[in-house]
Amino acid sequence: MSSQIRQNYSTEVEAAVNRLVNLYLRASYTYLSLGFYFDRDDVALEGVCHFFRELAEEKREGAERLLKMQNQRGGRALFQDLQKPSQDEWGTTLDAMKAAIVLEKSLNQALLDLHALGSAQADPHLCDFLESHFLDEEVKLIKKMGDHLTNIQRLVGSQAGLGEYLFERLTLKHD
């Protein structure tokens, strides 16, 4: 059955939104994996666990926001298989933060690509929606992760375990 409310919402944009929803759910799944990795008894970094579990929740909420917009525009949500995280062992906080920045940059690029598609399709509602709810948040998160990465790299040296512990205690406990 076709939508009664669909107006100026191309099938290309609809498909791209569905792909972006999948990317957000995959990111949420990855952050959940990261969070519970740092919650393990042999890793035990509570602040790092909390940081990544909060990100998992934020990405799930982002997927839901996209799905709600899809329905409001008369599009159809088509769920795809969710790919498991690329790894099960995440190593150090430094390794995990590097992986997280790569993930966030890929999400940001997908958002920019969708925004460009919306502009090309003359869809100002989509562009405004992305600008209001996603693009600024992504830039701020990438900056925050970059700052965390810089601080971790400063602390990690010959005393890598101590540096990781201090970062977790002094930085992530206050986020």
Curated annotation (Swiss-Prot):
* Localization per Swiss-Prot or TrEMBL: Cytoplasmic vesicle, Autophagosome; Cytoplasm; Autolysosome
Segments of this protein annotated with the region Catalytic site for iron oxidation:
54-61
- GO-annotated molecular function: ferric iron binding; ferrous iron binding; iron ion binding
Top-level taxon of origin: Eukaryota
User: Residue limits of the Ferritin-like diiron domain?
Assistant: 7-156
Residues with the modification N-acetylserine, per the entry, are 2
Under the heading PROSITE patterns, the entry gives: FERRITIN_1, FERRITIN_2, FERRITIN_LIKE
Q: Cite the binding residues for Fe cation.
A: 54, 57-58, 61, 64
GO process terms (BP): intracellular iron ion homeostasis; iron ion transport
| Principal location listed in the UniProt entry | cytoplasm
Question: What GO cellular-component annotations does this UniProt entry give?
Answer: autolysosome; autophagosome; cytoplasm; cytoplasmic vesicle; ferritin complex
UniProtKB keywords: Acetylation, Cytoplasm, Cytoplasmic vesicle, Iron, Iron storage, Lysosome, Metal-binding
Q: Which SUPFAM superfamilies match?
A: Ferritin-like
Its family remark reads: Belongs to the ferritin family.
- Spell out the note in the miscellaneous section: In horse spleen the light chain is the major chain.
What assembly does the database describe for this protein? Oligomer of 24 subunits. There are two types of subunits: L (light) chain and H (heavy) chain. The major chain can be light or heavy, depending on the species and tissue type. The functional molecule forms a roughly spherical shell with a diameter of 12 nm and contains a central cavity into which the insoluble mineral iron core is deposited. Interacts with NCOA4.
Q: What does this protein do?
A: Stores iron in a soluble, non-toxic, readily available form. Important for iron homeostasis. Iron is taken up in the ferrous form and deposited as ferric hydroxides after oxidation. Also plays a role in delivery of iron to cells. Mediates iron uptake in capsule cells of the developing kidney. Delivery to lysosomes by the cargo receptor NCOA4 for autophagic degradation and release or iron.
Q: What is this protein called?
A: Ferritin light chain
